[in-house]
């Protein structure tokens, strides 16, 4: 079986001492990868945490021994990020806790540079951060500035840009706002004294919107083609946030929820939302597609979803998301603090689970898909094993064998119309004498209930509503999940697609070109299936439309694989088969 590049276990490990965070990679002028990261012998924020580098000459397959940017005997130093200027000089920018205040988020913004592609590093320099209201009102009265940085600096018109949050309470992280650090003359500076640093926006108050709560952190910035600065960050509102600046960072729009191209808000827990611009001018957005409002648990950061962005009229149109990475074990720590790498037409992503970090080659067809969603309109035939219709109430027909869900998957696609949405009325079932298969029934609030079983009592993760993953485990013979409330209407022909991805163990629904995300009534629209799900085929493999089904299935297709979101969208745009 071909390796699934989305499975993080197939990634290439990045070295560390034990704890490892923010593995960010730049391509140096010699073609090698220079990875900077925060590491330490213990866990996060413990003694001897420091910033290091490592070099790969084979695109992440192997790495050099760790190179100290700061020694572990120095005051705690963290959250290193990197950028390379055209001359080849590499900069490492990080938080250095020189005053010894007991917080991993306290200290100066420091940087060093390397003129030999990361092998050796200069003395330490300081970025002067302007003292503002958030600093003066912090728990140290401004004597220490509390902040950190997850951003990857970007270069534009000779300057460097990176976003940060300033924090009121140090480690507690319960009151923060966004700021932009801009360094002018950065690209051509021969000596750090030639760089002019600005803390923006102008004035005493940073970038935040109290309507979305007190948490506005982990800012990261990209520059649109005409110079608009686009900043994204995490919140505890269940949504990522964005703001834009048209005047080089001096003023900013009121931060708002990020939204898809059709205006629906995107969802993300309190986890790093990362935006990245490729050399083709298109964007990727890393997020988790659920709206759990707090820190979350292992599940809230697994899987990772990615949305493709297309620039239009000084804004970004974000497409429907795909699963980029997953851990097949949903009980372990999820992935976060990513970076994206582009070299010679190929793409990679890095991530960390705090005790292990990896790099991952990205399937180029996945990126082509997310970047072309708005134009794709060809019907996808690869994997079709059944294509027929129309079917009305009481119809029966034989279907092919579906793949085992132990690594395999399937997709059910229907063009379907309801004359009524009467609760408990059967729509379609494949369950026979052995009670294996799937069953679709009309449920309350214009939803459909999907049930699936392989005949065994299985445990599966219910919707994620607590900090303990085990608390969400349910034992049941029949897995079930519903479409979002009110996504279906009477008298309309819907494009309804059920995707069962047995590799990632994720089941999802799409209706009329939209990936259902739980809307306003649930934290998510996708759902885990059991890790051990296998054969759901009954002996006779007969599908039956409900005897009292109030409607018509104009066309039904089965695929012997999971379809990507982008493929489903292409089918939707292609329209109902003639």
Regions found by a protein language model. Give the residues of each.
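Beta-rich carbohydrate-recognition and catalytic domains
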Residues: 1-21, 26-75, 84-146, 154-218, ...
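Short beta-strand micro-motifs enriched in acidic
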Residues: 28, 83-85, 224, 278, ...
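Structural motif
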Residues: 32, 89, 159, 228, ...
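Repeated scaffold domains used in trafficking and secretory/extracellular systems
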Residues: 78-81, 269-273, 336
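Generic recognition of flexible, low-complexity loop/linker segments
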Residues: 218-220, 230-231, 272-273, 293-294, ...
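Extracellular glycan-associated modules
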Residues: 377-578
């Amino acid at each position: 079986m071909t390796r699934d590049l989305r499975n993080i276990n197939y990634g290439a490990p990045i070295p560390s001492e034990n704890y490892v965070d923010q593995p960010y990679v730049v391509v140096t002028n010699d073609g090698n990868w220079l990875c900077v990261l925060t590491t330490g012998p213990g866990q996060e924020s413990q003694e001897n945490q420091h910033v290091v580098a490592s070099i790969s000459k084979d695109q992440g397959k192997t790495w050099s021994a760790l190179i100290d940017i700061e020694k572990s005997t120095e005051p705690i130093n963290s959250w290193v990020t990197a950028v390379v200027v055209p001359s080849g000089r590499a900069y490492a920018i990080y938080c250095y806790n020189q005053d010894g205040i007991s917080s991993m988020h306290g200290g100066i913004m420091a940087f060093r540079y390397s003129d030999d592609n990361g092998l050796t590093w200069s003395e330490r320099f300081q970025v002067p951060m302007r003292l503002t209201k958030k600093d003066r009102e912090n728990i140290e009265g401004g004597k220490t500035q509390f902040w950190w940085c997850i951003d990857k600096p970007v270069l534009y018109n000779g300057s460097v840009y990176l976003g940060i949050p300033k924090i009121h309470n140090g480690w507690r992280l319960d009151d923060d706002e966004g700021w932009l650090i801009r360094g002018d003359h950065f690209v051509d500076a021969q000596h750090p004294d030639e760089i002019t640093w600005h803390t923006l926006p102008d004035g005493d108050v940073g970038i935040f919107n109290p309507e979305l709560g007190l948490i506005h952190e982990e800012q990261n910035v990209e520059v649109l083609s005409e110079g608009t600065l686009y900043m994204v960050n995490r919140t505890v509102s269940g949504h990522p946030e964005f703001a834009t600046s048209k005047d080089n960072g001096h003023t900013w729009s009121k931060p708002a929820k990020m939204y898809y191209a059709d205006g629906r808000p995107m969802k993300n827990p309190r986890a790093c939302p990362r935006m990245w611009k490729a050399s083709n001018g298109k964007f990727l957005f890393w997020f988790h597609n659920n709206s759990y409002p707090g820190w979350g648990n292992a599940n809230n950061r697994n899987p990772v979803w990615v949305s493709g962005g297309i620039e239009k009229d000084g804004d970004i149109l974000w497409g429907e998301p795909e699963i980029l990475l997953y851990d097949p074990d949903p009980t372990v720590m999820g992935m976060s603090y990513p970076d994206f790498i582009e070299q010679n037409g190929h793409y990679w992503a890095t991530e960390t689970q705090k005790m292990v970090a990896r790099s991952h080659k990205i399937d180029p067809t996945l990126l082509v898909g997310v970047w072309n969603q708005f134009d794709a309109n060809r019907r996808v035939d690869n994997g079709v094993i059944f294509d027929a219709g129309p079917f009305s109430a009481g119809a029966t027909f034989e279907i092919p064998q579906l793949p085992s869900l132990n690594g395999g998957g399937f997709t059910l696609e229907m063009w379907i119309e309801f004359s009524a949405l009467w609760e408990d009325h059967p729509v379609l079932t494949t369950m026979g004498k052995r009670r294996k298969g799937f069953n679709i029934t009309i449920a309350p609030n214009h939803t459909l209930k999907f049930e699936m079983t392989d005949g065994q009592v299985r445990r599966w993760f219910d919707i994620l509503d607590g900090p303990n993953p085990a608390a969400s485990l349910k034992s049941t013979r029949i897995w079930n999940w519903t479409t979002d409330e009110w996504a279906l209407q009477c008298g309309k022909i819907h494009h309804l697609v059920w995707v069962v991805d047995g590799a990632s163990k994720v089941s999802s629904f799409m209706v009329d070109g939209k990936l259902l995300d739980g809307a306003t009534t649930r934290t998510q629209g996708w759902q885990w299936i059991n890790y051990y799900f296998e054969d759901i085929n009954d002996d006779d493999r007969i599908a039956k439309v409900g005897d009292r089904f109030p409607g018509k299935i104009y066309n039904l297709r089965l695929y012997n694989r999971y379809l990507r979101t982008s493929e489903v969208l292409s089918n939707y745009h292609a329209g109902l088969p003639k």
